Amino acid sequence: MEIGCITISHKNAKVEEIEKIWLTVKPRLEDVISKCSFSEYAYIFTCNRFEIYLVGENLKSCLQDIAEELGITGKAEIFVGESCLRHLLRVASGIESMIVGEEQILGQVRQCFNLCREGGQAGEVLERVFGKAVQVGRRVRRETAISKGSVSIGSAAVEVAERVLGTLKGKKALLVGAGEMGTLVAKAIAGKEVEAVLIANRTYEKAEELAKRIGGVAVKFDKLVDYLKVCDVVISATSAPHAVITRGDVERAMRERSQKLLIIDIALPRDVDESVAQLDGVELLTIDDLRRISEENLARRREEIAKVEGIIEEELEQLKLLLKDISARDAIAAMYSLAERFVGEEVEELYAKLNARYGVSEDVKEILNDFANSLIKKFLREPTVRLREAARKDEFHVIESIKYVFGDGNGRVSEGKDAKVEEGKPEVDVQRSKAES
């Protein structure tokens, strides 16, 4: 068993390339990864990255085949084993993000994994791995300043708008979209002394709710063109599967305005028709244009990144031990399962003989079962310890030999054995606790 991943991100690809790959892969994801021998999979998709995680055998070559099939060999990165685990911890910690330290990625990792778990694609191994990633992401933000004063994609868009226009003071801003990203934009722009923040959303009530929170004004979504005529900057961040601002919309608006119009599209898929950039008097920026903010952000946080990496390496060692224990557990279960099956048969036979000869009560059977279970635990205690040691030393041939000798371990596992095997198992919950929601 090994874990591996293939990733394409903002480091090597533009947003539209990532989007195109996702739209190509999404409807046939299982077909794409079918060339790999795997037991579990999960994926992460955001505006800046698309990653597939697999648990299986001989993953490196098949992940390379996937990259070749998708035409991303030169842009994709492939990680297997320890490097894959480290990569996921880095992603959840925010140090692989375009905006270093941004907090949104932690929720995205959790959300993507939960979808895969609910769909039955992710199992125990990935649950432990992603659970650890979420734990590490929380710890990093609690113990370091990596997210202190950090900017999200939303607030980076506001910063870019401020740079392009010189100031946002006294300007009119139109925000299209009142979801998670739109909320981040709204919070960032509310403190910039703008003259007005107009918020448009397909569900008008959501626009009203967000407007009340920041002191903005909710406007009707079907009247976008009217507001394009009067606003200085438009930031669009919906989750629509198609463009919500067309070239025709902007052309009609520009006929009735004399000043330049700045439009920033931070949605994925894109909210604004790309050809809008060709219009006179219009400047269209996208997520790719936020890279310079990312570079400045990285320079400011270099010292904190070193602290984060220290935490990641510490937690990585714990995760590796946990996964090794999981690999040993099947072999341990096989030993106990076979022993219990035979002992159970022998106890029944012995009780029948004692009952026939001495007329013993049912209480005697309970005593015999207690004795048998105690004998099993004592007899297999040392082999159990040795198997765990073998796993931690990467001596997996020992584990495979035990599984071959004792079978697949599908029999019932007793409570006594279960407590032994599961001892020290950490409680990992990928989902946000009620206290955090």
From Swiss-Prot:
Keyword Transmembrane: no
UniProt: substrate binding residues: T46, C47, N48, R49, S97, E102, E103, Q104, Q108
Full protein name: Glutamyl-tRNA reductase
The EC number(s) this enzyme carries: 1.2.1.70
Record's keyword terms, sorted: NADP, Oxidoreductase, Porphyrin biosynthesis
Annotated site (Important for activity): H87
Organism: Archaeoglobus fulgidus (strain ATCC 49558 / DSM 4304 / JCM 9628 / NBRC 100126 / VC-16)
Region Disordered, residue ranges: 410-437
Database matches in CDD domains: NAD_bind_Glutamyl_tRNA_reduct
UniProt-annotated binding residues for NADP(+): G177, A178, G179, E180, M181, G182
PANTHER family for this protein: GLUTAMYL-TRNA REDUCTASE (PTHR43013:SF1)
Pathway membership: Porphyrin-containing compound metabolism; protoporphyrin-IX biosynthesis; 5-aminolevulinate from L-glutamyl-tRNA(Glu): step 1/2
